[in-house]
């Protein structure tokens, strides 16, 4: 058996991998208006200019932690696809129980 894992059951040698865009500086995709809308939802009236970069940094750390845990659950289950339940369990592990996504 060639070392193609669980998914490689077809014939041939496995084609070329698709090109994947290099991800960099995507945190800037969290725009100033988006942060402002989140703050408004939280009841904030005025926002300091320094808040935007700080918010991006905090959000990045939070998402890195949640995604790391979710991927750990996925790998333990020997899957390659992260499911909604993986994310729910990852959030629960961090003390942020999320309802409405199964389980």
Swiss-Prot record:
N-acetylserine modification sites are: 2
Q: Which residues are modified to Phosphotyrosine?
A: 52, 89
* Outcome of mutating residue 33 to A: In TEBIVANED1
N6-acetyllysine is carried by which residues? 6, 9, 13, 17, 32, 92
Q: Where, per the database record, does this protein carry N6,N6,N6-trimethyllysine?
A: 21
| Superkingdom of origin organism | Eukaryota
Here the cross-link named Glycyl lysine isopeptide (Lys-Gly) (interchain with G-Cter in UFM1) sits at 32
Q: What is the effect of changing residue 64 to Q?
A: In a breast cancer sample; somatic mutation
- Result of mutating residue 33 to L? In TEBIVANED1
Which residues are reported to carry the modification N6-(beta-hydroxybutyryl)lysine?
9, 13, 32, 78, 92
Q: List every position bearing Asymmetric dimethylarginine.
A: 4
Where does the record place the modification N6-succinyllysine? 13, 32, 78, 80, 92
Residues found modified as N6,N6-dimethyllysine = 21
Cross-link Glycyl lysine isopeptide (Lys-Gly) (interchain with G-Cter in ubiquitin): which residues? Answer: 92
Entry's Gene Ontology molecular function annotations: DNA binding; protein heterodimerization activity; RNA binding; structural constituent of chromatin
Provide the positions where the record notes the PTM N6-(2-hydroxyisobutyryl)lysine: 6, 9, 13, 17, 32, 45, 60, 78, 80, 92
Compositional bias per record (Gly residues), positions renumbered to this chain: 1-14
Q: Which residues carry this modification: N6-glutaryllysine?
A: 6, 13, 32, 60, 78, 80, 92
Relate the protein's function as given in its record: Core component of nucleosome. Nucleosomes wrap and compact DNA into chromatin, limiting DNA accessibility to the cellular machineries which require DNA as a template. Histones thereby play a central role in transcription regulation, DNA repair, DNA replication and chromosomal stability. DNA accessibility is regulated via a complex set of post-translational modifications of histones, also called histone code, and nucleosome remodeling.
| Name of the molecule in the record | Histone H4
Q: Which gene encodes it?
A: H4C1
């Amino acid at each position: 058996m060639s070392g193609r894992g669980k998914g490689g059951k077809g014939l041939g040698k496995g084609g070329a991998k698709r090109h994947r865009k290099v991800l960099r500086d995507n945190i800037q995709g969290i725009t100033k208006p988006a942060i402002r809308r989140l703050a408004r939802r939280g009841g904030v009236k005025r926002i300091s200019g320094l808040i935007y970069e700080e918010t991006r940094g905090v959000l990045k750390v939070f998402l890195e932690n949640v995604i790391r845990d979710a991927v750990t659950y996925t790998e333990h289950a020997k899957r390659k696809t992260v499911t909604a339940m993986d994310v729910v369990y990852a959030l629960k592990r961090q003390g942020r129980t999320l309802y409405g996504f199964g389980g």
